[in-house]
């Protein structure tokens, strides 16, 4: 049986929303809600942070937490340091966004299934855009990266631009005429692959698009893609939190 550990990178010093992991959501800090959403579908879960306030909050609700450097450029780097400190013994590390308190356990199961294929090195998730999605706020939104897949459900490219370009049709006809995929920022890596990719220098495409997964593709790694119909709600700003609290109240 393969063993899966979920690591939740959590920084206090967010530019747009300082202290975000500790933001109160109906009596629980957001980081606790993320932790509780995923803990039953993984062999182990751990928060990786660089801030003692987050460490204390996780310990207070009985979660596992590891202190990491404040110099990491990405959540992937923080995951690898945490994995080294926890001690090895897991086959796959799942990198879980600390600002998605409604992440669905089914999404974790979908990404785990990708590793039934012994050749899977890295896996991530996508969600198809709906044909009735608002074009401007969905497909045109650079904060919602798009993905194109090959016949083996591997990522060929990720972009903040719209890919593919539909020639000969008006923009308004694009969504009904083609299945576009939105990237969901959940990753999983085999342990050895995680070690390798954290040692790669930043790549030209990564710097151009500001998408770290392009570094892996540029260096020849394959990214298996699981398809989910579950929507995720990422919280980047205090305004996003207001919407999330309204969603929580209506559940």
Swiss-Prot record:
InterPro entries named among the record's database cross-references: Cytidylyl_trans (IPR003329), KdsB (IPR004528), Nucleotide-diphossugar_trans (IPR029044)
Main localization of the protein described in the UniProt heading: cytoplasm
GO biological process: CMP-keto-3-deoxy-D-manno-octulosonic acid biosynthetic process; lipopolysaccharide biosynthetic process
Short name of any one Pfam family annotated for the protein: CTP_transf_3
Enzyme Commission number, as recorded: 2.7.7.38
Catalytic activity: 3-deoxy-alpha-D-manno-oct-2-ulosonate + CTP = CMP-3-deoxy-beta-D-manno-octulosonate + diphosphate
This protein's GO CC annotations: cytosol
Pathway: Nucleotide-sugar biosynthesis; CMP-3-deoxy-D-manno-octulosonate biosynthesis; CMP-3-deoxy-D-manno-octulosonate from 3-deoxy-D-manno-octulosonate and CTP: step 1/1; Bacterial outer membrane biogenesis; lipopolysaccharide biosynthesis
Location(s), subcellular: Cytoplasm
Keywords: Cytoplasm, Lipopolysaccharide biosynthesis, Nucleotidyltransferase, Transferase
GO molecular function terms listed in the Swiss-Prot or TrEMBL record: 3-deoxy-manno-octulosonate cytidylyltransferase activity
Cytoplasm found in the keyword field: yes
Domain of life: Bacteria
Entry-linked Gene3D superfamilies: Spore Coat Polysaccharide Biosynthesis Protein SpsA, Chain A
UniProt function note: Activates KDO (a required 8-carbon sugar) for incorporation into bacterial lipopolysaccharide in Gram-negative bacteria.
Recorded family membership: Belongs to the KdsB family.
Protein name: 3-deoxy-manno-octulosonate cytidylyltransferase
